[in-house]
UniProtKB/Swiss-Prot annotation:
Naturally occurring in which organism (per UniProt): Chlorobium limicola (strain DSM 245 / NBRC 103803 / 6330)
InterPro entries linked to this entry: 6-PGluconate_DH-like_C_sf, 6PGD_dom2, G3P_DH_NAD-dep, G3P_DH_NAD-dep_C, G3P_DH_NAD-dep_N, NAD(P)-bd_dom_sf
Pathway this chain belongs to: Membrane lipid metabolism; glycerophospholipid metabolism
Family, similarity comment: Belongs to the NAD-dependent glycerol-3-phosphate dehydrogenase family.
Binding site for sn-glycerol 3-phosphate: 105, 136, 138, 191, 244, 254-256
Protein name: Glycerol-3-phosphate dehydrogenase [NAD(P)+]
Amino acid sequence: MHIAVLGAGSWGTTLAVLLARKGYAVNLWAHRPEFADQLAAERENRRYLNGVRFPDTLRVFTSLHEAVSPADMVVTAVPSQALRETVEQIRDLPMQGRVIVNVAKGIELKTGKRMSEVLLEALPGVRISGVAALYGPSHAEEVSKEQPTTVVASSPSVETANRVQEVFHTSMFRVYTNTDIIGVEIAGSVKNIIAIAAGISDGIGYGDNAKAAIITRGLAEMSRLAVSLGGDPVTVSGLAGIGDLVVTCLSRHSRNRYVGEEIGRGRSLDDVVAHMNMVAEGVFTSKAVYDLSRTKGVEMPITQAVYEMLFEGKPVQQAILDLMTREPKKEVY
């Protein structure tokens, strides 16, 4: 079996290595030719995943067409806001019969579309039954070291979800299946926004009570939005929801939590992002989800607060005061 992995960041590289370790022929595509040449020469990704050697069955490509042409399965691991422009470059390739597995977590800013919707629009011939999302609490730094990890492969097609499960499952990378791709994609997107809020709380110096409140009420926002779009509320209690939410809000590896923490300490968003080595998906997703929540009439006060702090310059302390002094309500999910 041939598998193409599009995106040579930490997560794309990790999955490429995982699949190659299983013996699959893996084509890893890097966006920048000079970076691809470096990966091919050094046989590891020293920029994002230093010390993890590439198996012999992993090849690095600069050409999207060459990477994808022989592939039975295509894994999209580029940033969510770059997904459409990336896959549109291969729209002339026949996609029937291929499984597309997206691992990018976000909502497209300009359209409010989920990642599976973007793939369906950008790739003629692709059907939703051939698209899957692989989400869950899975930091690349741990997966690459073969530390125990559990994720969920979600597709409206049971057959596709099972196929993805079979391909990715290892003794240390346990894959469950799920058919609620709407709930999974919304959960995977919203959790990054809530992680920014959790980081802001850390940066200010608040304690465990505040963090627990953010995670719990953030889960409520995640559930409300998922349900409004046709998702199953049970999904947010699984790996793509509470599982990924907890790890992203608490882990030292979390880019989104780091962005929030630095903002809580007084740094500007532009300054934080300019000095980061990797993409924090929650930044643009906060605007996309805020816009989507307004369109759907879904109350998401934490998401709104993050959006206002990041994009409208609202002072952190004022945003927190506004959150805490809202009209008292029932605890309704």
